């Protein structure tokens, strides 16, 4: 498997725009009442896949959320961090503890 390195000095305009969009979605999600349609809609927009009956407790930080796939009946507790340039998959029936950091990218030296 090739190692994916992130070099922010060479980011494309599309990558920058997606980063801004993800940051804004995270901010809005972190300030939205949970268990509402608006909250659920923001979660669906932020992640690549978000399974049925799964819950995300805020606050959270998500970078490149479209690379994150969450299975069914997953609970992610508060203060989670997803840095997902290399992709992150959480399968069905998983509990992610509070303050968990899921990181699949590397930075250029």
Predicted regions and their residues:
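Terminal amphipathic alpha-helical/low-complexity segments used for targeting or macromolecular assembly
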Residues: 1-53
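Flexible, glycine/small-residue-enriched loop-and-beta-strand segment within the central core
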Residues: 37, 60-70, 75-109
């Amino acid at each position: 498997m090739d190692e994916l390195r992130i070099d922010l000095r060479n980011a494309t305009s599309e990558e920058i725009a997606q980063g801004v969009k993800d940051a804004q979605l995270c901010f809005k999600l972190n300030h939205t009442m949970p268990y509402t349609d608006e909250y659920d809609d923001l979660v669906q927009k932020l992640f690549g896949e978000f399974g049925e009956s799964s819950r995300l407790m805020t606050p959270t930080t998500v970078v490149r959320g479209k690379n994150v796939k969450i299975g069914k009946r997953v609970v992610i507790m508060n203060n989670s961090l997803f840095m997902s340039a290399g992709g992150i998959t959480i399968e069905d029936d998983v509990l992610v503890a509070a303050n968990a950091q899921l990181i699949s990218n590397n930075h250029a030296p």
